[in-house]
Amino acid sequence: MGLEEKLPGGILLSTVEKVAGYVRKGSLWPATFGLACCAIEMMATAGPRFDISRFGMERFSATPRQADLMIVAGRVSQKMAPVLRQIYDQMAEPKWVLAMGVCASSGGMFNNYAVVQGVDHVVPVDIYLPGCPPRPEMLLHAILKLHDKIQQMPLGVNREEAIREAEQAAMALTPTIELKGLLR
């Protein structure tokens, strides 16, 4: 029994949000922010063995104004943080951020004054990808999880309110440098 038999008269019912989410998830243009060894794995993902282009990401954007996904790969220094925020602010809406690797997610093994202890203190992060460095398969899995998140994202006024609340919640978190963990 195929789809044609289940749909009366060939009519498919959906919402604009679901259709827009479906279309939007298949055409992400990433702006790479490769700062360390994770960038090498990100480049390998674009090669023929892993083929990131099957997810609609064959074009890596050279300018933030044409990108809608920022992949932060590696540690972010205190001096690089304002540049990262400026690039994020230049990206057009809708935009998403993927923190690739332990250094981008939490500062990694560089627990000192010069390294930002998690890029989420500079820009709101949508997907965290662990690993040192994460394998290309893990990056592809994170992209698929981001696709799911994009497809469920609301549109219009509801979307702007959801983004505002998420960004305020992310910026209000306790900085990881103040947390007492294994390295303290």
Curated annotation (Swiss-Prot):
[4Fe-4S] cluster binds at residues 37-38, 103, 132. Binds 1 [4Fe-4S] cluster. It catalyses: a quinone + NADH + 5 H(+)(in) = a quinol + NAD(+) + 4 H(+)(out). Its cofactor is [4Fe-4S] cluster. It is found in: Cell membrane. Its EC number is 7.1.1.-. It comes from the Bacteria. InterPro entries: NADH_UbQ_OxRdtase-like_20kDa, NADH_UQ_OxRdtase_20Kd_su. The keyword Chaperone does not apply. GO terms for biological process: aerobic respiration; electron transport coupled proton transport. Keywords: 4Fe-4S, Cell membrane, Iron, Iron-sulfur, Membrane, Metal-binding, NAD, Quinone, Translocase, Transport. SUPFAM superfamilies: HydA/Nqo6-like. GO terms for cellular component: plasma membrane; respiratory chain complex I. The keyword Cell membrane applies. It is a peripheral membrane protein. NDH-1 is composed of 14 different subunits. Subunits NuoB, C, D, E, F, and G constitute the peripheral sector of the complex. NDH-1 shuttles electrons from NADH, via FMN and iron-sulfur (Fe-S) centers, to quinones in the respiratory chain. The immediate electron acceptor for the enzyme in this species is believed to be a menaquinone. Couples the redox reaction to proton translocation (for every two electrons transferred, four hydrogen ions are translocated across the cytoplasmic membrane), and thus conserves the redox energy in a proton gradient. Belongs to the complex I 20 kDa subunit family. This is NADH-quinone oxidoreductase subunit B. It comes from Mycolicibacterium gilvum (strain PYR-GCK).
